[in-house]
Amino acid sequence: MAHSLPTARKLAVVTGTTSGVGLAVARLLLERGWHVLGAARRPSAIEHDGYEHVRVDLSDIDSLGTELASRLTALLGSRTLARVGLVNNAADPGLLGPVAALDPRRLAHVFAINVAAPIWLMGTLVRLAPPTAPLRVVNLSTGAAARPFPGLAAYGSSKAALRMAGMALAAEIDSTPDPTLRQRDIALLSYEPGTVDTPMQAWARSQPPAVLPSRDLFLRFEAERLLVPPTAPARDIASFLEADRAPRFQERRLGT
């Protein structure tokens, strides 16, 4: 579907906007006057003049290079943009089980969604965003990226890889011989939203212990009412996207 260029001067690209944190972030940014380009496999429930949705399978590299790439090129080419944001929220936690039993094809699928697509999006926005517009990038992380959880090797290691990709991009910008790139206002955040009440949590609680030995932890989160609504991390993320000067790279967790 053809779209006109937005009148808003702030553009955010958010993946996984059909539920959970991604949906909450998109709605909050729209309330704050952003134009939001959402990307997800399923249709979006958001109905707002400032929102447009691209249905895309982030594991399909070819689809990234067609409709999503062309729309990003059109949006980021607008000279009226005063701020650009990227929220890499979409993730596939679906490959569970011990390392010795993981299927390499499913591993490739998980890493395509959780690592390859976010890295491609980061590079695309650095390359195409107006150099005078502050660029803020948020990569959603997880406790499983730093702590081992039995049964979550694929998900945790993919999130650890995304964390390192963000750090590497920040180091590249700081060390580049290109003074124009080095002096740009680009900041990256690796953000751990904590225990959020999302479909992913419910899905983890439903798994058999043989597949997810750490299932009891997710059951405890619900039983002890430790789950927070998606709007809580959404506020943190929106605040970072709207922040003035920030460190090139930082890590934060909900409530810190």
Language model: regions and residue ranges:
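N-terminal Rossmann NAD(P)H-binding glycine-rich loop of SDR-like oxidoreductase domains
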Residues: 18, 26
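Conserved glycine-rich Rossmann-like NAD(P)H-binding loop of the short-chain dehydrogenase/reductase
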Residues: 32-47
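Rossmann-fold cofactor-recognition segment
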Residues: 49-62
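Conserved NAD(P)H cofactor-binding loop of Rossmann-fold oxidoreductase domains
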Residues: 87-96
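Catalytic Tyr-X3-Lys loop
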Residues: 92, 100-119, 162
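Conserved internal alpha-helix within the Rossmann fold of NAD(P)-dependent oxidoreductases
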Residues: 117-122, 146, 237
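Catalytic loop of short-chain dehydrogenase/reductase
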Residues: 136-182, 192-195, 205
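C-terminal helical subdomain
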Residues: 182, 186, 190-191, 198, ...
